[in-house]
């Protein structure tokens, strides 16, 4: 929804005849940064500040790398490039469309992924654990990994990079999301190690056991879902909401996971703000709440033996 403040900003942009006044990449970076800074928009879907969003919007739309050498910032733009950039900025502030959807690009664990509105935008704090190869959480290098609720496939693909000898199954209920995951698996040339599977959680996984299950399931409770900024309404609700306490799907995973873990297997799960409700409901369960280097919260690890021990609670 466009606010009155954003409407005034749009009017100013149109009056300023920006495409004629600005010439270089640096001009457009500065202008985009200023506009996003002044706008009534939300940051938090891949980037938490207007400068990083500006870099992605400008450079990605020009088909340039995010680490473009600064000496190229003085390169002049063509009229069509300038018009494209102005329209993208207008769409960002008028419609509140996330930058990742405007550019069909998001970054996770240092890798670029294709994204569109069929899947949520990669931003899981699990990225910090993947980059540390789940140090102190697993006792040996995993041969078989499951990414449950894979969405764009970013966690599965990042795990495949982190563990070059592992095979990774990427499971999602949504066929649309899996189509996006397949694009990313192909782009990263990992078809021989990352396998997309359409399944309602474990339903279509037959006989396979995993050394590591990683999952970022829907976990937003009804109250938070209703209060989310406009940008989140572009993401598929199926991938966000999970009942009144945000834990409907997580509870199913906790109950079923031990049947799909090897003897020393580990479940790593993100529940975000719903961690408070999870702790309150299961005070005796030894969830290991992981301290994340990137500042995120709400990620726990739990051993298979503990899932078995407390199985009847879930």
UniProtKB/Swiss-Prot annotation:
Bilayer-crossing regions: none
GO biological process, one term: methylation
Molecular function via GO: nucleic acid binding; protein-glutamine N-methyltransferase activity
EC top class, as a word: transferase
EC number(s) on file: 2.1.1.298
Domain of life: Bacteria
Catalyzed chemical reaction(s): L-glutaminyl-[ribosomal protein uL3] + S-adenosyl-L-methionine = N(5)-methyl-L-glutaminyl-[ribosomal protein uL3] + S-adenosyl-L-homocysteine + H(+)
Alphabetized Pfam families for the sequence: MTS
GO cellular component assignments: cytosol
Key words, A-Z: Methyltransferase, S-adenosyl-L-methionine, Transferase
Annotated family: Belongs to the protein N5-glutamine methyltransferase family. PrmB subfamily.
PANTHER family from the UniProt entry: 50S RIBOSOMAL PROTEIN L3 GLUTAMINE METHYLTRANSFERASE, RIBOSOMAL PROTEIN UL3 GLUTAMINE METHYLTRANSFERASE
Chain's role: Methylates large ribosomal subunit protein uL3 on a specific glutamine residue.
Protein name: Ribosomal protein uL3 glutamine methyltransferase
Name of the gene encoding the protein in the UniProt record: prmB
């Amino acid at each position: 929804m466009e606010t009155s403040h954003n409407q005034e900003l749009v009017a100013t942009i149109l009056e300023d005849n920006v495409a004629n006044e600005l010439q270089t990449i640096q001009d457009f970076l500065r202008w985009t940064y200023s506009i996003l800074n002044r706008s009534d928009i939300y940051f938090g879907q891949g980037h938490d500040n207007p400068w990083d969003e500006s870099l992605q919007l400008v450079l990605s739309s020009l088909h340039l790398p995010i680490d473009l050498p600064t000496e190229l910032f003085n390169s002049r733009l063509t009229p069509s490039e300038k018009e494209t950039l102005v329209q993208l900025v207008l769409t960002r502030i008028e419609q509140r469309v996330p930058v990742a959807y405007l550019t069909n690009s998001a970054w996770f664990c240092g890798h670029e992924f294709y994204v569109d509105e069929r899947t949520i935008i990669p931003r899981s704090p699990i990225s910090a654990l993947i980059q540390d190869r789940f140090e102190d959480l697993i006792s040996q290098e995993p041969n078989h990994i499951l990414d449950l609720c894979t969405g764009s496939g970013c966690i599965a693909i990042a795990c495949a990079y982190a563990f070059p000898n592992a095979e990774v199954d990427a499971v999602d209920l949504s066929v649309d999301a899996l189509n996006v995951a397949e694009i990313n698996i192909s782009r990263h040339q990992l078809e021989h190690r990352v396998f997309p599977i359409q399944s309602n959680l474990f339903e279509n996984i037959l006989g396979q056991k995993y050394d590591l299950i990683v999952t970022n399931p829907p976990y937003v409770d009804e109250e938070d879902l209703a209060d989310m900024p406009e940008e989140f309404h572009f993401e598929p609700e199926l991938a966000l909401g999970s009942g009144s306490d945000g834990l409907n799907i997580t509870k199913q995973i906790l109950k079923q996971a031990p049947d799909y873990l090897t003897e020393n297997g580990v479940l790593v799960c993100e529940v975000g703000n719903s961690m408070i409700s999870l702790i309150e409901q299961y005070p005796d369960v030894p969830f290991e709440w992981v301290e994340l280097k990137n500042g995120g919260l709400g990620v726990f690890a739990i051993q298979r033996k503990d899932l078995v021990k407390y199985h009847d609670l879930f």
